[in-house]
């Protein structure tokens, strides 16, 4: 995988391949906004991304910067990946599908750097479970981004904690499978590992 704007456009086209929308594989042509929902369920603007006419060049820049930094091996990929994803989200290059694309790119870049846990445990489910933490980290890291004065550390910490949690879940799953127990016992064991509320999907992840 060579990370380029064209590669990202191809992924986006595949993502929207079965959609009635004709936006797949195309950068945005109208201004978009990153919105969030408050405690009362009301939408508000969290961040205003780059304008459409700046998008293509910005995507080219961040792809080149990531590839160059990765090749120099001075910074660990686990730091470079969150920085790239943060820039991607600030640019918000597509009219729709930016969140899904960011998680797909996160998984693919982790694969390329040897972190394969996304094949077995969904990073998407982690984001959904901790949506407030995601938006808080993103909002904090986006302050000053347009002026090059952002502090991306909150987003790096968020993504690293998500990756760590995913590996812990994977380890729990391996422990359950390695014991070769019955399906019923496996489910009981999985439930015992959970504290507080949990969903059926979370238990299914632990019981392949």
PLM region descriptions:
Residues 1-208:
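FIC/Doc superfamily catalytic core
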């Amino acid at each position: 995988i060579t990370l380029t704007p064209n590669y990202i456009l191809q992924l986006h086209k595949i993502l929207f391949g079965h959609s009635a929308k004709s936006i797949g594989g195309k950068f945005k042509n109208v201004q978009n906004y990153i919105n969030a929902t408050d405690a009362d369920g009301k939408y508000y603007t969290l961040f205003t991304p780059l304008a459409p006419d700046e998008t293509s060049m910005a995507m080219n820049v961040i792809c080149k910067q990531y590839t160059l930094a990765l090749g120099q091996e001075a910074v660990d990929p686990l730091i470079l990946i969150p920085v790239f994803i943060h820039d991607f989200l600030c640019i918000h290059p597509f009219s729709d599908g930016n969140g899904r694309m960011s998680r797909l790119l996160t998984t693919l870049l982790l694969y390329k750097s040897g972190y394969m846990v996304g094949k077995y445990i969904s990073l998407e489910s982690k984001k959904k479970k901790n949506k407030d933490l995601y938006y808080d980290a993103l909002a904090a890291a986006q302050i000053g981004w347009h002026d090059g004065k952002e502090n991306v550390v909150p987003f790096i910490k968020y993504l690293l904690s998500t990756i760590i949690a995913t590996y812990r879940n994977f380890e729990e799953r391996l422990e359950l499978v390695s014991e070769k127990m019955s399906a019923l016992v496996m489910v009981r064991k999985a439930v015992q590992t959970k504290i507080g509320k949990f969903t059926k999907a979370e238990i299914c992840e632990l019981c392949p």
